[in-house]
Regions:
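N-terminal catalytic cores of secreted or lumenal carbohydrate-active enzymes
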Residues: 1-66, 70, 74, 80-87
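Short alpha-helical segments and helix-capping/turn motifs at coil-helix boundaries
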Residues: 25-26, 82-92, 124-130, 171-174
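Substrate-binding cleft/loops of secretory-pathway carbohydrate-active enzymes
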Residues: 32-33, 77-122
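Short, flexible loop/turn elements at secondary-structure junctions
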Residues: 42-47, 76-79, 117-119, 145-150
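Catalytic-core region of carbohydrate-active enzymes that cleave or remodel glycosidic bonds
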Residues: 61-62, 68-71, 100-176
Length: 176
């Protein structure tokens, strides 16, 4: 599979030994002889659904065969509290309960789930304690993209209304 090979080549480029790896030799020839120390890799971006979960499993299994400590970051889509995000979380927690994830990752997690969210400032303020009660079961969370600009909350977007003090306060409350 070309996609799987692309992931493996990317990791080899970032972390391989230039004396024994052609991809690491490319990195060296680009002026960076030392490995980057890549310890986690995202698989997809805002992907979700059964097809994505199946592809994630194929990619992460191939990665873990060669790099058992590499932490794979699973996409959960961009709609919190929707069935699509729940499917990703359920799958990630099931993987974390088995021996399928990373074995000795940089964070200690077996897998990381990347949530994205674009909502109103009020939604973000209300979600300030969102992750306080998340189970700590080997499936960590990374909130990789967010914006309190209201776009997905059905609010009209204007240059003046997209990023205001209200959106800054909503995001700040969320980050606490």
């Amino acid at each position: 599979n070309n996609v799987i090979q692309d992931y493996l080549d990317l990791i080899e480029f970032a972390n391989g030994d230039p004396e024994s790896s052609s991809w690491a030799a490319v990195r060296r020839d680009m002026g960076h002889p030392e490995p980057f120390g890549l310890d986690m890799i995202g698989v997809g971006n805002e992907n979700f659904g059964a097809d994505y979960v199946a592809k994630f499993d194929m990619i992460s299994e191939a990665i873990h065969e060669r790099y058992p400590d590499m932490l794979c970051v699973m996409s959960a889509g961009l709609f919190p509290f929707q069935p699509t995000m729940k499917r990703s979380w359920d799958h990630a927690r099931a993987l974390a309960a088995t021996d399928s994830g990373a074995h000795d990752s940089a964070t200690g997690d077996a897998i990381i789930v990347d949530e994205h969210s674009y909502h109103s400032p009020e939604w973000f303020a209300y979600q300030a304690s969102r992750f306080d009660a998340y189970p700590r079961c080997g499936a960590g969370v990374y909130f990789g993209e967010y914006s309190a600009n209201g776009y997905f909350a059905g609010q009209p977007q204007t240059e003046q209304g997209a990023n205001t003090w209200k959106s800054a306060l909503g995001e700040a409350a969320f980050l606490t």
